[in-house]
C-alpha cells in the first residue's frame, strides 16, 4: 500500500520560511507544507513559462489561508478546503502558519523547483518577499 503521513515522510526540505515534509509515491510528490510567514512567490517564478508555476496541484488546507494568482483572477483556499490549482499560477499570499498537503507530479515539480532554487540563490542574502 502506498501511503504517507506528516510523521512518516522521509524527506524534509526547508526553504526559508517554507517547511516541506514530503514523499514520492508512484510519480507524485505528496508534500505536507507549512508556510511560516506571508510570501509572494512572484520573484521565484521568473524563468518558468509565463513566469508562472506550470505544475498542477491537488490538495487540502488544514489550517490558515493561501492565495493563488492567475492571469485573470486570484483564488483563495482556506482551512477545510480541498483544492485543485491548475498550471499557470503564482502563490502570492498566505496567512502565516498556513498548513496544507498537496499532490504534485514529481517530474513537473522538479523542473519548477530547479528554476525557483536558482532564483532564490540569486537573491540578496536575507531577503524575502
What residue ranges belong to the model's regions?
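Short, conserved beta-strand element in jelly-roll/cupin
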Residues: 51-68
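Charged, glycine-enriched surface loops/patches
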Residues: 73, 115-119
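Short histidine-centered beta-strand/loop micro-motifs
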Residues: 42-52, 70, 93
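General beta-strand recognition
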Residues: 67, 76, 99-101
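A short, polar/proline- and glycine-enriched secondary-structure boundary/capping micro-motif
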Residues: 42-44, 78-80, 103, 111-114
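A short, N-terminal "cap"/entry segment at the start of jelly-roll beta-barrel domains
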Residues: 1-42, 49, 116, 124-129
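Ligand-binding loop in jelly-roll beta-barrel domains
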Residues: 87-112
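Short acidic-glycine-tyrosine-enriched beta hairpin
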Residues: 70-88
Amino acid at each position: 500500500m502506498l501511503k504517507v503521513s506528516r510523521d512518516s515522510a522521509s524527506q524534509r526540505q526547508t526553504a526559508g520560511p517554507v517547511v516541506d515534509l514530503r514523499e514520492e509515491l508512484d510519480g507524485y510528490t505528496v508534500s505536507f507544507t507549512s508556510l511560516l510567514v506571508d510570501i509572494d512567490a512572484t520573484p521565484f517564478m521568473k524563468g518558468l513559462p509565463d513566469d508562472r508555476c506550470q505544475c498542477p496541484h491537488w490538495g487540502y488546507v488544514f489550517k490558515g489561508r493561501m492565495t493563488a494568482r492567475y492571469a485573470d483572477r486570484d483564488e483563495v483556499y482556506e482551512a477545510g478546503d480541498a483544492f485543485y490549482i491548475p498550471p499557470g499560477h503564482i502563490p502570492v499570499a498566505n496567512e502565516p502558519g498556513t498548513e496544507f498537503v498537496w499532490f504534485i507530479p514529481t517530474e513537473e515539480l522538479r523542473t519548477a523547483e530547479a528554476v525557483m532554487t536558482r532564483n532564490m540563490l540569486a537573491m540578496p542574502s536575507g531577503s524575502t518577499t
